[in-house]
């Protein structure tokens, strides 16, 4: 708990269940604090280690913070925009509101009504910005490049997880469900692995309630193909960077995605990426002389098979894309860069 009188930015989280938005807050706020930003969170479902304020502390929003004309309220959902509008416009509190939009779909009339009343809007990708009818600043997500980094020894990284160090591995990480394209990944591996005995595949992630049958069907499909010992379903892990470090190629097979951090996490670990053209993937993965991977059409199994094979069968290309991905994430996608860009938006409102 921190004294709201020492807080200039409030980051609300009004959703109890863990989501991508909540995860963004959890990862960003400590970095923002480390960079000197006077930010605190508000709401449930967040680690107690984060600096926070209480709802009853909001009474202090009538007073300006020292040296500033107002505070900033950084909303990421409709349910967080509405109370801020009421505090600012109805109660006349000293507040400016920022909204970050990650949605790649047409906004409802209600969402548009709220967004038009923001003092500043951030879009998490160029595609997201295209769905906004108001001026906005594009700030791509970043990742913790200290947490996601290559192994000192890939052989040892594989051994530590009980994997065969003599094999190369293709991975697909995230929730196991149709929307995430897990079935496309599995089917592509069923097509590719039989004639590539030196490769294996890893599916890391959890299937929840309605998706358990989907996962079971995929495992049955793998077993029928005689690949149960080569396409591994390892479940959900908290040490996911260790699993990236054991990979040689990563596939992001999503049919739909809001942003999608997994390609960045893979590239930061020195792993080339094959990704579908959804979310922000086409803005993260690059081709040409600085190739970090390949972008393919969504829901296209043949394209996925061909793209994965292009790396699996070309070791020099695989190695070059690995080095390029590492350089690209380090230069352009460190989470500190995201935090500084967001701070510039805050500053523009608190001058």
Curated annotation (Swiss-Prot):
The species is: Rhizobium meliloti (strain 1021)
UniProt xrefs under PANTHER family: COLANIC ACID BIOSYNTHESIS GLYCOSYLTRANSFERASE WCAL-RELATED (PTHR12526:SF640), GLYCOSYLTRANSFERASE (PTHR12526)
Q: Listed GO molecular functions?
A: glycosyltransferase activity
* Protein's name according to its UniProt entry: Lipopolysaccharide core biosynthesis mannosyltransferase LpsB
Against SUPFAM superfamilies, the record matches this protein to: UDP-Glycosyltransferase/glycogen phosphorylase (SSF53756)
* Alphabetical list of CDD domains matching this protein: GT4_PimA-like
* Function per UniProt: Acts at transfer of mannose group to a 3-deoxy-D-mono octulonic acid (KDO) via an alpha-1,5 linkage.
Q: What are the recorded Gene Ontology BP terms?
A: lipopolysaccharide core region biosynthetic process
Q: What class of enzyme is it?
A: transferase
Family in the record = Belongs to the glycosyltransferase group 1 family. Glycosyltransferase 4 subfamily.
Work out whether the entry's keyword set contains Transferase.
yes
């Amino acid at each position: 708990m921190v004294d709201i009188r020492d807080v200039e930015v409030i980051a609300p989280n009004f959703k109890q269940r863990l989501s991508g938005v909540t995860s963004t807050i959890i990862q960003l706020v400590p970095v923002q604090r480390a960079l000197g930003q006077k930010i605190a969170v508000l709401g449930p479902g967040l680690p107690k280690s984060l600096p926070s304020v209480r709802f009853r502390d909001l009474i202090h929003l009538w007073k300006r913070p020292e040296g500033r004309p107002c505070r900033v309220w950084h909303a990421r959902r409709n349910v967080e925009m509405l109370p801020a509008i009421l505090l600012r416009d109805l109660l006349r509190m000293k507040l400016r509101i920022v909204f970050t939009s990650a949605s790649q779909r047409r906004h409802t009339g209600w969402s548009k009504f709220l967004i038009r009343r923001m003092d500043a809007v951030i879009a998490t990708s160029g595609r997201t910005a295209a769905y906004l009818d108001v001026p906005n600043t594009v700030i791509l997500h970043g990742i913790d490049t200290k947490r996601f980094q290559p192994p000192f020894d890939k052989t040892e990284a594989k051994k530590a997880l009980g994997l065969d160090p003599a094999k190369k591995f293709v991975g697909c990480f995230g929730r196991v469900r149709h929307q995430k394209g897990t079935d496309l990944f599995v089917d592509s591996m069923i097509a590719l692995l039989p004639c590539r005995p030196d490769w294996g595949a890893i599916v890391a992630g959890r299937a929840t309630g309605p998706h358990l049958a989907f996962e079971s069907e995929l495992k049955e499909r793998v077993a029928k193909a005689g690949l149960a010992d080569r396409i591994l379903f390892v479940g959900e892990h908290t040490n996911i960077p260790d699993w990236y470090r054991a990979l040689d190629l990563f596939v992001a097979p999503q049919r739909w995605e809001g942003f999608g951090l997994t390609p960045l996490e893979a590239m930061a670990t020195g792993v080339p990426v094959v990704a579908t053209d959804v979310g922000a993937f086409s803005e993260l993965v690059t081709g040409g002389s600085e190739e970090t991977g390949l972008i393919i059409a969504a829901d296209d199994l043949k394209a996925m098979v061909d793209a994965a094979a292009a790396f699996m069968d070309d070791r020099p290309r695989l190695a070059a894309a690995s080095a390029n991905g590492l350089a690209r994430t380090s230069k352009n996608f460190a989470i500190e860069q995201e935090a500084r860009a967001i701070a510039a938006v805050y500053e523009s409102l608190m001058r």
